[in-house]
Amino acid sequence: KGANERYCCDLEKVKKAIAAVKQGLTSLHPGDISTTQNPIIFRPEQQAAIDKTKKVFRRGNQMLWNAKMRFGKTLCALRVARDLEMKRTMILTHRPVVDEGWFEDFGKIFYDRPDYHYGSRTKGESFKALEYLASKGDRYVYFASMQDMRGSELVGGKFDKNNELFSTSWDFLIIDEAHEGTQTELGKAVIEELTKADTKVLQLSGTPFNLLDEHSEDEIFTWDYVM
């Protein structure tokens, strides 16, 4: 039985939705939904984090942002992905509820880049669709739950799942709330399996006390409310 929901929209969005379905997509790109988006002007401290990370990634693969809440870590991390033209980016977090926030911020950063797509189990495109788009030259950001990834047989879990995620050559791995769920045996195994030789890893945390020893001073950006 078909759905009977009705939504108000203009003719152009209907045309774009039909075109998206013909391409095998399950959602419109954020740029096709809103026509009022403007580029985000980052605060000086945010731009400093972005610039330092790009500089570090030119010679290394690891970066940690020690930044308190309200800094804007999500937007800034996505800006790094955009500036460096990352083809395959994974967002890994112990808090799957933040998928909505990442999806919204993706639209703010990539609204004018139709070659970038977002996917997760609940938002945007499926992983299969994203890989198809990547095979055509597009780029994507995929959101994954640490809890789900830890359950995979490949890293010592109990379920035969996520093999396609682990076998993907990720260009960029963003670990959100990196102080949570990453220091257990399974958590470390997940990160190790996802991180290939050339994968850039950016860890985000407001309280990264269990992570500081893993990074050199040059690989850490710090921001607090009093700075």
Predicted features by range, described:
Residues 31-66:
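Conserved pre-motif I regulatory segment
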Residues 217-227:
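Interdomain hinge/linker at the junction between the two RecA-like core domains of SF2 helicases
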Residues 2-40:
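Non-catalytic accessory segments flanking enzymatic or RNA/DNA-binding domains
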Residues 111-155:
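Inter-Walker segment of RecA-like/P-loop motor cores
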Residues 59-61, 135-139, 155-172, 196:
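Short basic/glycine-enriched coil/helix segment immediately N-terminal to the Walker B
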